[in-house]
């Protein structure tokens, strides 16, 4: 049995769950999310918690068991608390600022990079070297953070670029000087 899949999903008073056919909809104070379910898992509600069970022990059902448990758990957490990812910008002259709904990044190129957040994602710049990405869909928050980071990944020699908060950049030594 999947160690992740067999754990119950705790439900708060704020989250409301609807299961229609093969679609689960979770709504809460921050918004609502829906996910299409596979026919390999069955969802039941017991003692203010959701349980995800698989229909048989086939390889496909075992693979889907833990996946759908975590997808539903992330939906419940997202509509009640939301998710936030923090990016840090390092480098001389590198900065970020909001221009209306667009994030304007100065990353050492000859032009500014403008990024428009998809619907459901909120971008903030508390200071010039920090970008906060928040939303209710964990996968979308991570995808947007990865997209922004891809504009200038941190390089190993000086550490310049955009990195996740808490990410450790493995540094390299430069070339040794010749005689």
UniProtKB/Swiss-Prot annotation:
Tagged with keyword Ribonucleoprotein: yes
Instruction: Please give the Gene3D superfamilies that the UniProt record associates with this protein.
Output: Ribosomal protein L6, alpha-beta domain
The terms describing its cellular component in GO are: cytosolic large ribosomal subunit
Gene Ontology molecular function, alphabetical:
rRNA binding; structural constituent of ribosome
Cite a single GO BP annotation: cytoplasmic translation
Keywords for this protein: Ribonucleoprotein, Ribosomal protein, RNA-binding, rRNA-binding
The yes or no answer to whether the keyword Ribosomal protein is present is yes
Under the subunit heading, UniProt states: Part of the 50S ribosomal subunit.
UniProt family annotation:
Belongs to the universal ribosomal protein uL6 family.
Q: What does this protein do?
A: This protein binds to the 23S rRNA, and is important in its secondary structure. It is located near the subunit interface in the base of the L7/L12 stalk, and near the tRNA binding site of the peptidyltransferase center.
Q: What is this protein called?
A: Large ribosomal subunit protein uL6
| Organism annotation | Chlorobium chlorochromatii (strain CaD3)
Lineage of the organism: Bacteria, Pseudomonadati, Chlorobiota, Chlorobiia, Chlorobiales
